[in-house]
């Protein structure tokens, strides 16, 4: 326990919990304090002035990060016939219809993102209790219900990140790896923040973006001055 406390204190050193850092400085602090023995993910948290309990204040969408996420994304596609073949050629990890339904319905989730052609949704919709809580239910609003399965697979593999506001009004997302250079992380963060701003619901009143912070997987959060991520209401 003493070793853990010492490590945590070392990570926290030099980070003022009450200060808003400009984005470039915050990225530097996060990278300097990423001491895990693996390539940690850099994550962003945005506190929004919305109440997601109301349907007209839901914030969700998808954004293609210019420098990818650094993750290997496993993609499942529900499709038949030619569309199934297109998905396979595009690099989908798992492709199927009824047989894939049975696998997923049995609780075996060996993928990170799920895509479906429109004709498959009556079947896929029955997996709501399995895919819904994991945020994997295909949705046309984020491009995962589509006839262009090849493009959807390519986007998923190439850096597409879905976002959805949580109950407390917070959006979390991984936007790169500690091994990325600072400029690439900054570009990804600004691209992500811009997408969240553009997804602002018309019913949201007052201050939309309340707080922004970034961290690494095992690190502490560093508060970011929203104006430095081009966040303007």
From Swiss-Prot:
Q: Which UniProt keywords apply?
A: Repressor, Ribonucleoprotein, Ribosomal protein, RNA-binding, rRNA-binding, Translation regulation, tRNA-binding
Reading the lineage from the top rank, the first entry is Bacteria
Q: Name the GO cellular-component terms.
A: cytosolic large ribosomal subunit
InterPro entries attached to this UniProt entry: Ribosom_uL1_bac-type, Ribosomal_uL1, Ribosomal_uL1-like, Ribosomal_uL1/biogenesis, Ribosomal_uL1_3-a/b-sand, Ribosomal_uL1_CS
Query: Does this UniProt record's set of keywords contain Magnesium?
Result: no
Any GO MF annotation of the entry: rRNA binding
Query: What function does this protein fulfil?
Result: Binds directly to 23S rRNA. The L1 stalk is quite mobile in the ribosome, and is involved in E site tRNA release. Protein L1 is also a translational repressor protein, it controls the translation of the L11 operon by binding to its mRNA.
Q: Which NCBIfam families match?
A: rplA_bact (TIGR01169)
Q: Which family does it belong to?
A: Belongs to the universal ribosomal protein uL1 family.
Q: How does it assemble?
A: Part of the 50S ribosomal subunit.
**The protein's name in its UniProt record:** Large ribosomal subunit protein uL1
